[in-house]
Amino acid sequence: MEIRDVETVNRINLHSHIAGLGCDGDEVEYDKDGLVGQIKARKAMAVIRKMVESNKGGKVVLIKGDRGSGKTALAIGLSKSLGGVHFNSISGTEIYSLEMSKSEAITQALRKSVGLRIKESVKVIEGEVVSLSGRRIVLKTVDMESSFEIGEKMRGELDKEKVSAGDVIRIVRERGRVYKIGTSMVKRSDVVGTDTRFVPCPEGELIRITEETQEISLHDIDVVNSKAEGYLALFSGETGEIRAETRDEVNKKVWGWINEGKAEIVRGVLFIDEVHMLDIESFAFLNKAVEEDFCPVILVSTNKGECIVRGTDEPSPYGIPRDFIDRALIISMEKHCRRDLEAILRHRILEEDILIDDDAVDRLVSISEASGLRYSMNLLTISSMRASRRNGRVALGDVERAFELFLDEARGTESFNG
C-alpha cells in the first residue's frame, strides 16, 4: 500500500505582518510597519494613539471606507503601536447571544478595555540559599545571614522551583510565592550546562519592602467578585450575566484604591468592527456608556454608506444613528491605487515566504483592482499550494488556474443569475 504525505496549510493571519502605524514622530512613511499608503488616515490615528497614551477615554472614533481599504489593518496598527495597553476587538454581530443581553455583552467588552494598575508595597526576603532542610531555610546576603522557618505550602513552592543551596531566590511571604532569580556566581565552576543564569549574591538586608505593580482589567475584577468561584470563570470564559450590584461594589473599591493612591485607571481601546450591525438599542447604550468615568476610547469601523439603522425605519449615514455620529471623530480611508495594492501583496508574499514570478504578481495586482484585495490574497494562497506540488515558484499559469476555479463576487453573482 502506498503511503502519501498529506499537504497541510499553515494559516497566517491576514494582518500578521502589521507591526505599528509606521509613524516616526509626526512623519508618516509611505510603507512602514506593514501599512501602505493611507497617509492622512495614519496621521489621524497617530493623534488617537497620543490620546490613549495620555489616558483620555470617553471618545468615539469612526473609521469609514470601502471593503478592502484597510480599516481593520489601521486598527491593528494602533493596537501594535500601543504595546501593552488594553485593546479589545469585537464584531458588531458578537453582541447578539442567547446567553446574555446586548447591554451585558457591550458592558463586558467595555470593561475588558479598561485596566486597573495596582501599586502594592510587599515585604520580600531575598538572598542566597545557604542550606535547606525540613522546615528551615538559611539565607544570606553579602552583609548578613539568617534562618527562617517555612510551612508546608512554602516548602512545596521551593520544591517546585527546584531550589537548592547556592540559588538566589526571592520569597513573597504574603502571597506564598517563591521566585528563583538564578544561581550564585560563586557556584559557576560547579555547575555544568549553559542554561543556568548566574547572578551576584544580594547586598544589604535580607528582608526589605519593595513596590510591585500589576495590571488587571475591570472585567476580570467583576468576574472574580461575581460568585464564590468567580476566578474559575476567568479560565473557562463562561462568565454569564454579572449583576449590576457587583459592578457597583467593584467600582466603589476601585475608587477607594484610586483615592488612597494604591491604583490608577488605564483606559484602553474597544474596537467594534462592522458597527452598522448594531441596533438602535445598542447605540443608545453606547451613547450613555461614553459619558461614564471608566469608558475607554471606542473605535468603530464600517463600509456602509447611507442605510437603515437596525431596529428602525430611518436611513442614516453609515447605518449609525445621527446622535452617535455627532460624538465621533471620523477617519476616512482612501481607495488603494495600483502601487498600494502591489506593495500590500508584496508584504503578504514575504510574510508567507512564497516564491513568485513578477508576471504572476502583476496579474494578482490587476485582479485586486477589479475584485478586491481579499480575493487576490486567497488566490495567492491557492496558487502557492498548486506550485508547491512541483516544488516550484508561483507562475502566471498557477494564478490563472486558481482564477478559473474560484469565482470572485461579480462572476459568482453572474453565474447564479444565469
From Swiss-Prot:
Its EC number is 3.6.4.12. SMART domains: AAA. ATP binds at residues 65-72. The keyword Transferase does not apply. It is an enzyme of class 3 (hydrolase). It is found in: Nucleus. It holds the Pfam family TIP49_C. Keywords: Activator, ATP-binding, Chromatin regulator, DNA damage, DNA repair, Helicase, Hydrolase, Nucleotide-binding, Nucleus, rRNA processing, Transcription, Transcription regulation. It comes from the Eukaryota. Its main location: nucleus. Gene3D superfamilies: 1.10.8.60, P-loop containing nucleotide triphosphate hydrolases (3.40.50.300), RuvB-like helicase, domain II (2.40.50.360). One of its GO terms (cellular component) is nucleus. Transmembrane segments: none annotated. It catalyses: ATP + H2O = ADP + phosphate + H(+). GO terms for molecular function: ATP binding; ATP hydrolysis activity; ATP-dependent activity, acting on DNA; helicase activity. Component of the SWR1 chromatin remodeling complex, the INO80 chromatin remodeling complex, and of the R2TP complex. DNA helicase which participates in several chromatin remodeling complexes, including the SWR1 and the INO80 complexes. The SWR1 complex mediates the ATP-dependent exchange of histone H2A for the H2A variant HZT1 leading to transcriptional regulation of selected genes by chromatin remodeling. The INO80 complex remodels chromatin by shifting nucleosomes and is involved in DNA repair. Also involved in pre-rRNA processing. PANTHER family: RUVB-RELATED REPTIN AND PONTIN. This is RuvB-like helicase 2. It comes from Encephalitozoon cuniculi (strain GB-M1). The lineage of its organism: Eukaryota, Fungi, Fungi incertae sedis, Microsporidia, Unikaryonidae. The gene is RVB2.
